[in-house]
Amino acid sequence: MPDYIRISRAADSLRDIKITPHFLPHTDGSCLIECGNTKVICTASIDENVPPFLRGKNQGWVTAEYGMLPASTASRMLREASAGKQSGRTQEIQRLIGRSLRAVVDMEKLGERQILIDCDVIQADGGTRTASITGAFVALQIAVGKLVSDGILSENPIREAVAAVSVGVVNGVPLLDLDYPEDSGCDSDVNIVMTASGKIIEIQGTAEDAPFSLDELGKLVALAQKGIGELLQHQQNALSAA
């Protein structure tokens, strides 16, 4: 089979990225993140309560919910509320978002409160979970900045930034930031979450069509690190404009 050739961008290029801060007015932090044709609204809401297992422990919590609008895909999706339960995929993704954000937050400095993250996909073209993480961090940082500017917190509990991107192999070619056609036809698919200091929070990798070697995984991680560096700059630009 011939090697895959991208038409619209280089193999090591991200899709066009745009992050619009303060996208919604009725929340403590929000943004719209656009990764090519994938678009996700991310919000952060401050709650002056914590889950029961944290009461009285003088520390906070960050948790996340994720969902897709019925018309976000080519064929209308059934609302999970209509089905009466969340899918396993939805639960997996929202746990991933929460874990990724908690990894960069000092919960004691956050104090006994929680921040609720909502990621709603309004248009899907691959990479919705990674876009959600990248956008959710912007919403979280805006909400935490509000706590600091209002004098509720004396210092920012966020240790460093976090972003995520997908990488994969299509017909033997390593690619950065897969869109839906690439993702659905790839040999392997890996989602990587990384901090600004280059530390890995999570690697989710699957051989969809052909197993991959440790050497190939290393190349994919390096490719992801390049893309995440660019995403971190987009986050910084959005927050500077907020």
UniProtKB/Swiss-Prot annotation:
InterPro entries: ExoRNase_PH_dom1 (IPR001247), ExoRNase_PH_dom2 (IPR015847), ExoRNase_PH_dom2_sf (IPR036345), PNPase/RNase_PH_dom_sf (IPR027408), Ribosomal_Su5_D2-typ_SF (IPR020568), RNase_PH (IPR050080), RNase_PH_bac-type (IPR002381), RNase_PH_CS (IPR018336). GO terms for biological process: rRNA catabolic process; rRNA processing; tRNA processing. Gene3D superfamilies: GHMP Kinase, N-terminal domain. Signal peptide: none annotated. Phosphate binds at R89, G127, T128, R129. Pfam families: RNase_PH, RNase_PH_C. Keywords: Nucleotidyltransferase, RNA-binding, rRNA processing, Transferase, tRNA processing, tRNA-binding. The keyword Nucleotidyltransferase applies. The keyword Nucleotidyltransferase applies. It catalyses: tRNA(n+1) + phosphate = tRNA(n) + a ribonucleoside 5'-diphosphate. GO terms for molecular function: 3'-5'-RNA exonuclease activity; RNA binding; tRNA binding; tRNA nucleotidyltransferase activity. Its EC number is 2.7.7.56. Belongs to the RNase PH family. Phosphorolytic 3'-5' exoribonuclease that plays an important role in tRNA 3'-end maturation. Removes nucleotide residues following the 3'-CCA terminus of tRNAs; can also add nucleotides to the ends of RNA molecules by using nucleoside diphosphates as substrates, but this may not be physiologically important. Probably plays a role in initiation of 16S rRNA degradation (leading to ribosome degradation) during starvation. HAMAP family: RNase_PH (MF_00564). PANTHER family: EXOSOME COMPLEX COMPONENT, EXOSOME COMPLEX COMPONENT RRP41. Homohexameric ring arranged as a trimer of dimers. This is Ribonuclease PH. The lineage of its organism: Bacteria, Pseudomonadati, Pseudomonadota, Betaproteobacteria, Neisseriales.
